[in-house]
UniProtKB/Swiss-Prot annotation:
This is S-methyl-5'-thioadenosine phosphorylase. GO terms for biological process: L-methionine salvage from methylthioadenosine; purine ribonucleoside salvage. It holds the Pfam family PNP_UDP_1. CDD domains: MTAP_SsMTAPII_like_MTIP (cd09010). Phosphate binds at S13, R55, H56, T88, A89, T192. It comes from the Eukaryota. It is found in: Cytoplasm; Nucleus. Belongs to the PNP/MTAP phosphorylase family. MTAP subfamily. Substrate binds at M191, D215, Y216, D217. Homotrimer.
Amino acid sequence: MRPAIKIGIIGGSGLDDSQILESRSEKVVSTHFGNPSDVLIEGKIAGVDCVLLARHGRNHSIMPSNVNYRANIWALKTVGCTHVIVSTATGSLQERIHPGDLVIPDNFIDRTTKRAQTFYDGNDMLVGVCHVPMEPAFCSRTREVLIETAKELGLVGVHNKGTVVTIEGPRFSSKAESNLFRQWGADLVNMTLVPEVVLAKEAGLCYAAIAMATDYDCWRDCGENVNVADVMATFKKNVTKVTQLITAVIPKIAEMDWTETIGELTKTVNGSIMLPHAY
């Protein structure tokens, strides 16, 4: 029997408008890990059950370090989500990725310092230590559907893969850091994908991201360096591409049989947990 598909959408800077949902209703959820960033907005897209959550709160009052990523992911799991699709604003570290382009990331580098990265932290609810493997980092099948849907829509400036460096923030990178990330082979820099992607995998959710390049960070010797005004202006100008892709991909995901994918993910997580034992 196929699992019932329910898709969580985590909206980042510039994409937390509940108008993309039909038959909207708000749901207050609290978790063992605290409260999520905002209420959950439940509704439908093309008849598919969806849940929208504003990562930074609907008034964008929560800085990246203070987002309760564990509560956000656990809240979506609690209400029955099988998938999570997120949007995120990023700085481009490569000339070929232009502001306004979309990237479907396939890997990450973690440069955060202050964030809880596991649900298995010694609490009474989840026993043991979870050494979850992060290859693949994102759900391969969900990424494939996003890529194919972008092609079908004829969206220009869509890159099929990319490595994202997640920094702690809220400050932007120094030029030395930006160039270091480029030397590492990174394509984008942002402040929110980690630990979100890690926690989603621990929770057994099929997670994929749509990253929008909003600027060139500060590595270039010519042109303006990243600033908030330009980031938001670029996102606002191109956000319709993100919403178009999300609304088109959701019915495609719902049509597919995810039994094996979800089963394999659950098996991976369960096999990663080391339980306490006596010597």
